[in-house]
């Protein structure tokens, strides 16, 4: 009798665990495999096996022998690395100030950050052209008072737009990590004589470093995948 009841309990547990959301997850994984994994796998396979069907590195030799491709790859990597560094340097202090101090307009800042993340790349880049382009509003306004600014077109413009567009990812991730931070660690460091910036450097940042690295990776990959901004401003 006891064995029968325990078997029935296990069956109910299995049915409970393999419920609606389990089916949803399986369906999503299948769709991801069909529409994401399969195309990339096929593309990767065909890069080594051209139309003839024999193994060859000719595609890679052609890519790395063309100066045009190498310059584009180098510039893309440079933009992504610089954007990641600047976005991290802006996002972390903003997140710390926002979570540790009761500043005026905190909700407005958070709302503006979230809204900036929702705008498509083309819209964001075009907005900056309207502001800082050759005939941009801010450009013309500064020219009237005798101030000339550099062109937004080119490397510096792409870096500016990418940084201001993507640092909110770091801000949001780090803000969440700091809100969930165990305050007893900071209190313990204070009692041991670790104060101010030294406490941030040796206590706070090491604890939230996985979050910072995750946010930096998202910034890097997003800037690498963004084609609209370089096309308009580059």
Regions found by a protein language model. Give the residues of each.
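Hydrophobic positions on the alpha-helical face of helix-turn-helix-like DNA-binding modules
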Residues: 188-189, 199, 203
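A short amphipathic helical element positioned immediately N-terminal to and/or at the very start
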Residues: 11, 56-64
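Membrane-water interface segments at the C-terminal ends of transmembrane alpha-helices
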Residues: 19-51, 65-179, 205-228
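Transmembrane alpha-helical segments of polytopic membrane transport and secretion proteins
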Residues: 1-28
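Helix-turn-helix DNA-binding elements, focusing on the entry/boundary residues of the two helices
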Residues: 185
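Short coil/turn motifs that cap or connect alpha-helices
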Residues: 104, 194-195
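Hydrophobic alpha-helical membrane segments of integral membrane proteins
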Residues: 230-233
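Glycine/proline-centered hinge or cleavage motifs at structural transition points of membrane proteins
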Residues: 192-194, 206
């Amino acid at each position: 009798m006891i064995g029968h009841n325990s078997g029935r309990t296990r069956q109910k547990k299995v049915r409970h665990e393999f419920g609606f959301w389990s089916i949803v997850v399986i369906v999503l994984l299948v769709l991801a495999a069909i529409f994401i994994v399969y195309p990339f796998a096929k593309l990767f396979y065909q890069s080594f096996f051209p139309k003839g069907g024999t193994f060859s590195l000719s595609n890679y030799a052609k890519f790395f022998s063309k100066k045009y491709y190498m310059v584009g790859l180098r510039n893309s990597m440079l933009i992504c690395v610089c954007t990641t560094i600047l976005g991290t340097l802006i996002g972390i202090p903003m997140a710390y100030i926002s979570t540790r101090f009761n500043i005026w307009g905190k909700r407005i800042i958070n709302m503006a950050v979230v809204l900036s993340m929702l705008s498509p790349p083309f819209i964001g880049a075009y907005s900056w052209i309207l502001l800082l382009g050759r005939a941009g509003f801010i450009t013309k306004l500064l020219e009237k008072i005798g101030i000339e600014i550099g062109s937004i077109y080119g490397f510096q413009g792409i870096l500016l737009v990418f940084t201001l567009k993507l640092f909110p990812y770091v801000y949001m991730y780090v803000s969440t990590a700091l809100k969930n931070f165990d305050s007893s660690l900071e209190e313990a460091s204070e009692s041991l004589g670790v104060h101010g910036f030294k406490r941030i450097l040796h206590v706070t940042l090491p604890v939230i470093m996985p979050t910072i690295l995750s946010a930096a990776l998202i910034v890097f990959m997003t800037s690498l995948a963004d084609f609209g901004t370089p096309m308009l401003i580059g």
